[in-house]
């Protein structure tokens, strides 16, 4: 059986291959949703309702799957600035005391929280109280009825675990030819789909317990257009190419074919109709906003160096855990060369659908 870690965070530290220096693709998406996030809070957050039954003057915010780097701090600051704006505009008495903010930064236990808090802007330390919350967001990580605004971006495609059958040699769902779910093998896709549905149910169920009545959950990320396999997107092409590089390394004895067959990424990009169905299935929330948004970088080709650096920052930890030390450098050196020889044809590749969703706890 595979030796996947229980958690698979982005590459830590602040070196050249770290996520902190290779997350601009995600930053552009966050910046693109910034105005919509503010509009959603101004329209849907009821400050009086949130604290009607509370003696506290603290508004709690959580960023789930925060990783490291500036993106999470920018998200949180935008939320706080908007709440302050709303509070001032409404001249809200808000329990008669100055409004304070507590921010919970959540990610897997082996996320690099040291780097996260070491790089926290000084100004933010004066604006809110910070707490690191290690744990999978597929389960409850905060006390019941304690959260006012939850946020998650570009993280829900990570599953809680690799579907068991895709690494079972006796199963028809064995993902023998690929290291991802690229939707080309139906048995593999179905195994991933089942795991995704369970994880989405667990995620929304946990947030329903944590959020107070009237609290908001803001989600953004990517889905596949209905009927389009991931293999036809540029992201799918990239990961399949990384898998090809691993097979080349196996032929030269650097790793083994068996190890590759037992390696499959715990990532599932659902089709937009699948994702919408799972959101609607949970009856604890009302859907205030559900819309498609554009990613500014979808309309221009990315450089090979950019692609290599981004995917190394994302996949470094899980590849190293499964294949051992020394494989990652060789793998991404080979990948960079293969990418230069066979560059991505962005005009032919299908594009992901970017979504922005606002849920309100009933």
Swiss-Prot record:
Q: Where does Mg(2+) bind?
A: 175, 261, 263
Q: Which UniProt keywords apply?
A: Magnesium, Metal-binding, Methyltransferase, S-adenosyl-L-methionine, Transferase
Known EC number: 2.1.1.-
The record's listing under InterPro entries reads: MeTrfase_7 (IPR005299), MeTrfase_capping (IPR042086), SAM-dependent_MTases_sf (IPR029063)
Q: Which biological process terms from the Gene Ontology are attached to this UniProt entry?
A: methylation
Give the disulfide map: none
Recorded GO molecular functions are: metal ion binding; methyltransferase activity
So which cofactors does this thing need?
A: Mg(2+)
Q: Which residues form a coiled coil?
A: none
Which residues does the record give as S-adenosyl-L-homocysteine binding sites? 19, 66, 71, 107, 136-137
What binding details are noted for the cofactor? Binds 1 Mg(2+) ion per subunit.
The entry assigns this protein to a family as follows: Belongs to the methyltransferase superfamily. Type-7 methyltransferase family.
Recorded protein name is Probable S-adenosylmethionine-dependent methyltransferase At5g37990
